[in-house]
UniProtKB/Swiss-Prot annotation:
Family of this protein: Belongs to the ATP-dependent DNA ligase family.
Organism taxonomic ancestry: Eukaryota, Fungi, Dikarya, Ascomycota, Saccharomycotina
Species in which this protein is naturally found: Kluyveromyces lactis (strain ATCC 8585 / CBS 2359 / DSM 70799 / NBRC 1267 / NRRL Y-1140 / WM37) (Yeast)
Binding residues annotated for ATP, in chain numbering: 273, 275, 280, 333, 378, 438, 443, 460, 462
Cofactors, names only: Mg(2+)
PANTHER family, per database record: DNA LIGASE 4
Binding-site list for Mg(2+) 1: 333
Enzyme class name: ligase
Designated name of the protein: DNA ligase 4
GO cellular component: DNA ligase IV complex
Gene Ontology MF terms: ATP binding; DNA binding; DNA ligase (ATP) activity; metal ion binding
Keyword line: ATP-binding, DNA damage, DNA recombination, DNA repair, Ligase, Magnesium, Metal-binding, Nucleotide-binding, Nucleus, Repeat
Length: 907
């Protein structure tokens, strides 16, 4: 028997869950209850499992490894979170758009740290059926077979929930799995981590070279067959790239150094390439084109999209290589090209363009869209059995041009220019911005190719958009408050990091908890592990960090920390916030947009930069309507809303008022508060009601008939709402809830309070009775006087977001093809919504009628902007205005929310 083969039948999947996955999950969720360091406990669980596998199953770990590291498995299920949720609701025979389905679709809003969608799904199933106790257990090999079946049913396309529910394999697994098995089965289907970020620990425990080897082969099966004996170590030559196995490519590093410093870092001998907006792919050309693989950096095979041999697909037939080339690997970018407009389109259309061409070829008709995939090669890393990674970039480029013949609009070689100084960088960046490109990439001409590395041999330079500055800020984590979901204290730099300053190097600015996924929380924890200091025991030096009255439980040195890109709609300068944070103000509704891996503590936002835009984002202080607690401190704990429907109403132990005592509420939709421009979820509405003495019910009687003291709250005409209306129910707007809280009693309904339904004239009005006495009259007069003294607040139109574009500097581009009246209408709408109209040179956002402007005029405008920005910038990150289509302004006004400008770029 081969030493790599297993000598025992495949164990049950439940055994894998019990011995490894379940123990890791339990340990990660109960760290504080473990009497030893959690890392030690993790290692014990993993090593014990590996010993158990080797002694009872064998040395071939691949069947289990595919389930333990699902995101590195090459199977493609194309099952998205929403698809799984809807499929499970259909499996449970729940009505379409049910409350359960809607809650699951919004699971991230209620997810504590470490909680995944699979936990919510299993909880719903647990409420409706018993745990599986049958004798027919699914083995690991059987589960892999069922997953193969699900992958084949997807056939490279995104699987819909109907198809998933009808899948024989999917249904069999659900009917023959315990709740714990289901949890990890769902994680595997969604390709999320099942080992709590401990994959590298597991691989290293299996074999010391496993992690390094996986970075050059990206194939779990190859790894399992090659590294079955931990005592046999790999040679250095084994860790080089090989044909048909994906590897992690070299990446460019972003820097904010001056142009001169960048040129110096590249030893004044480098090339400049355009930065492409596409998907990084490597083409493996095998045996003269008999087989061609298109692999992503993580080993995902997209050959079915672009052509599995030289005669199939939209790209492979255009790979014209020298007749002596038997095998090679091309590193490059797959982009989307519009053949009609002769332009490169945004990244999101890459795969759909390939699928459109494939479907058109199969149907024997012309493509329905004008866009198609285009591969741009920029490196050659393998040729005829030899790795070229140790060769200088100049030689690799030379070989690339000799073996590959470009085919226009299908396969091209990226153009580059040699450079030696900062002036060349400026000129190239100016040209890239003029063309609407992402930026440029600089590469040291004599550098080697470093697999899986991001270093300064390759440097990318991208412009920063003015519109982002003031809404998007790169902030450094300087502290954290631990809880179910960690909140991070973020700070601003207030001094030059290269100088010794008396002031703190960083000061607290805001606390961020929203926007980070569980995986990002774990990634931050991995990067900062062992570097936190307890504030009460070891406070930071005031010359290092400065905090206000609000201090974190733990703090961290800036050089050990992580940078977050934080987005917010306003700046909060209330007196209470001035004391909490050392900066004297904070962000209102701030959330993390992404972790900035390309930045460090030296390149984050500074306090002086923040001061330049602070006044433009303080209008929230002027809007005081719908204040729930009238300035009083709210209860520190809110009612916890269940994640599933409950037949019993939920009650609060200690409400802050009795405004809604003896009243029951059924909340059927979210609420958008137009005065504060924020959305309040169903769960938060329920919490507010509970805090003021009300009860929450999730269902009415089976006929949905009106009931005494039952208030149905909603402002969306959903299917559930229509059913309740047909049963003669009255649907009340959520704004009535806040009106009652402000007044301190249940106010009578007015027409504006009714969303749908008719208010019966004969209804019992005793429920609105209040004891009107002298104190009440004085309160009423005081309220009226306040309104007279401050008439501005009454003049604000609550339904019109007057401050939507507040202090944004906008310009509408004039064009001879656009009527003057159309331009005036747009400018008037911008002014009505608080925008400031300025000249194009001073704008942070330029609004263009994209369908009515010529490409020549657009290029000319970009050229002027680029020239000005590059000349004025001292760092290699010029700030330029964003150019957006007119639909950006119209959609923002329509939705009462500033739309993401990157989705409306002019092409």
């Amino acid at each position: 028997m081969n030493d790599c083969e297993n000598f025992s039948p495949s164990p049950e999947f439940k055994w894998l869950c019990d011995e490894l996955l379940g123990k890791i999950y339990e340990t990660s969720s109960k760290k504080h209850l473990i009497g030893k360091p959690v890392t030690v406990r993790y290692l014990e669980i993993i090593t014990n499992f590996i010993k158990l596998w080797r002694s009872t199953v064998g040395n071939y770990i691949y069947p289990a490894l595919r389930l333990i590291v699902p995101f590195r498995d090459r199977r493609i299920y194309n099952v998205k979170e929403n698809t799984l949720i809807k499929a499970l609701c259909r499996y449970l025979r729940l009505p379409k758009s049910s409350e359960t389905e809607n809650r699951l679709l919004r699971w991230k809003q209620r997810a504590a740290r470490g909680v995944k969608l699979s936990d919510f799904c299993v909880e719903e199933i647990r409420k409706r059926q018993k745990d599986y106790e049958g004798a027919n257990r699914i083995t690991i090999d059987e589960l892999n077979g069922y997953l193969d079946e699900v992958s084949q049913e997807g056939n490279g396309k995104r699987m819909g929930y109907m198809a998933l529910t009808d899948s024989r394999a999917f249904n069999y697994c659900l009917n023959h799995m315990t709740f714990m098995e289901m949890k990890f089965f769902f994680d595997i289907i969604l390709k999320t981590r099942v080992l709590s970020g401990l994959e590298n620990m597991f691989l290293t425990a299996w074999h010391p070279d496993a992690t390094d080897y996986l970075s050059v082969v990206s194939d779990l099966d190859v790894l399992s067959q090659r590294l079955y004996n931990p005592n046999e170590r790999l040679r250095q030559t084994d860790l080089s790239i090989t044909i048909s196995h994906a590897f992690e490519p070299q990446l460019a590093k972003r820097t904010h150094l001056s142009y001169e410093r960048v040129a110096s870092k590249l030893q004044h001998d480098f090339i400049i390439e355009e930065k492409m907006d596409g998907e990084r792919l490597q083409i493996h050309y095998i045996n003269y084109g008999e087989q061609i693989k298109y692999l992503s950096r993580r080993g995902v095979d997209f050959s079915y999209l672009y052509g599995e041999n030289s005669s199939s697909g939209p790209i492979s037939p255009s790979l014209k290589l020298h007749f002596n080339v038997k095998d090679c690997i091309l590193d490059g970018e797959m982009i989307t090209y519009d053949t009609e407009k002769d332009i490169v389109l945004p990244f999101g259309l890459v795969k759909s363009s390939a699928m459109n061409q494939i479907q058109s070829e199969l149907a024997g008709i012309a493509p329905t869209e004008s866009y198609k995939p285009l591969f741009v090669a920029f490196d050659l890393v393998y040729l005829n059995g030899k790795s070229l990674t140790n060769l200088a970039l100049e030689r690799r480029k030379d070989y690339l041009t000799k073996i590959l013949t470009p085919v226009e609009r299908s396969v091209e070689i990226i153009q580059y220019m040699k450079a030696i100084n900062a002036e060349a960088i400026k000129d190239s960046l100016e040209q890239a911005i003029s063309m609407g490109s992402e930026g440029i990439v600089l590469k040291h001409l004599h550098s080697k190719y470093f697999v899986g590395s991001r270093n300064t041999d390759w440097i990318k330079i991208k412009p920063e958009y003015l519109e982002q500055f003031g809404e998007n800020m790169d902030l450094l984590i300087i502290g954290r408050e631990q809880g179910k979901k960690d909140s991070f204290f973020c700070g601003l730099s207030i001094s030059d990091p290269n100088e010794v300053a008396e002031k703190p190097r960083f000061i607290s600015f805001c606390t961020i908890a929203n926007g980070l996924s569980n995986e990002e929380f774990k990634d931050i924890e991995r990067k900062t592990w062992g570097k936190w200091h307890i504030f009460s025991e070891d406070p930071p030096s005031p010359n290092l960090l400065g905090f206000g009255t609000k201090v974190p439980y733990e703090w961290i040195h800036p050089e050990d920390s992580v940078v977050l890109e934080v987005k917010a709609r306003a700046i909060d300068t209330k007196e209470s916030e001035k004391r909490k944070y050392r900066s004297g103000c904070t962000l209102h509704f701030g959330y993390c947009k992404q972790i900035r891996y390309d930045k460090d503590w030296k390149t984050v936002a500074s306090f002086s930069e923040f001061e330049d835009m602070k006044d433009a984002r303080n209008f929230y202080n002027k809007r005081k309507s719908h204040q729930v607690t009238d300035g009083k401190k709210r209860a520190s704990k809110r009612a916890k809303i269940g994640i599933v429907n409950s037949s019993e109403p939920t009650a609060l132990v200690a409400p802050v008022s009795n405004t809604f005592s003896n009243c029951r509420f059924r909340v059927i939709s979210d609420y958008f508060d137009s005065t504060k421009r924020r959305r309040i979820s169903q769960e938060d509405l329920c919490s507010v009601i509970l805090e003021h003495g009300g009860e929450i019910v999730y269902t009415s009687d089976e006929n949905n008939l009106p009931q005494d003291n039952l208030y149905i709250i909603g402002e969306k005409l959903t299917r559930e709402c229509k059913i309740l209306l047909n049963a003669k129910n009255l649907i009340i707007r959520p704004s009535w809830i806040f009106s009652c809280i402000e007044e301190g009693y249940k106010t009578p309904f007015t027409e504006s309070d009714i969303f749908r339904g008719e208010l019966e004239s004969s209804m019992d009005c005793s429920q609105f009775y209040t004891d009107f006495n002298t104190a009440s009259l004085n309160h009423l007069l005081e309220t009226a006087n306040r309104g007279i003294k401050n008439p501005d607040s009454d003049l604000l139109l609550p339904e019109v977001p007057l401050f939507l574009f507040s202090n944004l500097k906008l310009a509408v581009l004039n064009s001879e093809n656009v009527l003057d009246t159309s331009i005036l209408e747009v400018e008037f709408a911008i002014k009505c919504h608080g925008g400031e109209l300025v000249h194009i040179e001073n704008a942070s956002i330029i609004i263009v009628f994209n369908d009515f402007i010529s490409r020549e005029d657009l290029f000319s405008l970009r050229q002027k902007i680029a020239s000005k920005a590059v000349k004025e910038s001292t760092e290699s990150t010029p700030r330029i205005p964003r150019m957006v289509d007119i639909s950006w302004a119209l959609d923002s006004i329509k939705d009462n929310y500033i739309a993401e400008t990157e989705h409306y770029q002019c092409l």
